[in-house]
């Protein structure tokens, strides 16, 4: 449950978790890739800038003669016969096509452009030789006629076309599955048809001073949020449309996998250096409004831990992707399967592997509240062995709760700050989280996220090819390609966020209705929403554009209006 629709703040909830009772500001982020999230929550601002550099240049060979893992570093090595026909192996440039290769001259005469020698096809294993129209075509001569070279080039183009058509068909298929899953699992209507409509009205439930404070906080945080968003788009564009990343990463040496790891570290480090001032700016605002309790040492430690998690997850993805591109002809097939599996795996282990890096968790103390919560879960038919309390007060004054994981790792967590609220309001919050658990919202969201990841892997295959010349890379097998991949992933996240937020707003509304059905106490629900909105300084009247693009939860006035509509529908006194 959330009462905010503000610019993203670092780490509102753990990755893989269904958004909780509040998108509180100022907690540790857990993003991946190169996105800047200096201010978690529901406002613009994913991604980080990285400086532009360079102009378009022809691809440089990424191979290194001292690379012991590079087959071409050894004189007797043969190219990989399984190389993807859709992309040039960085170790074996493709021969020029009939339109761009030097025109053949008389027998034995050198080609007109000695700087672009024709080579045998990728995987052919033949030495590069000048080709002439009457070169010796006999077996064993190591030479091809111009006609033979032309046939090889045409066959390669046909194979590339077939591969791209297959990938395009797969992209359409996966996209259709995504739409079907989203349509089937999203609760587009959370109240029965004919439920009395109630219009949200901030002035009915909040004082003028509270509304003014929320507006002032929104204005203060919007500027860094939009600057962050703009820098994200700018940096991702530099990675995708210029040879900046290829030049920066081209100086790295070592086996290909070492260069990939170092490349992720280098690009992430550039991102962090550039986004650090934005993070400090936002943290200062949180302190000014009393939402942050951290000192600068704690804030720095959280950022460094978040960066480490980001580097780890990004490196795993890109190492797998580059390895597949170097070994498998149609690498996008196992890449899509792997992306789906990785998403499920990370969501499953996140509560027990990554969340403890940012908070300490203890069982809720014995007492009437714990007993009532466990009894409520039993009545709801949701098996819950424990309710955990996170030590969020060392970082924030905001109130929140969330459910994360699925299966054996599923758990319900409340912030220790929430325990200061009346027990009846805490029960409403946990009832909301039980709604997420009962409807398997984390699992549904994870499955949808996995399908989106698979869709993205196929999309990378189709997009990287046209960008090779512009970005100065040879193929996805080139370790320098990770810059393009990180940029594309960042842009894909920005483009898909509005659709994902639309879905989560409906999911959160269904969890609200579940809490009302379970407790049948709309008055306490409204009181709890007011407390959350005032404590967390929620945006009570979010801008329409920001709401559509960035709000992952309904606004507090919308949720209060929903409770009143539920009360009218069920014949309960309207709060």
Give a label for each model feature.
Residues 1-167, 176-179, 572-575:
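Actinobacteria-biased recognition of intrinsically disordered, low-complexity terminal regions
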Residues 144, 150-171, 180-242, 247-475, ...:
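Polar-ligand-bearing catalytic/cofactor-coordination segments
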Residues 476-485:
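N-terminal signal-anchor/signal peptide hydrophobic helix marking the start
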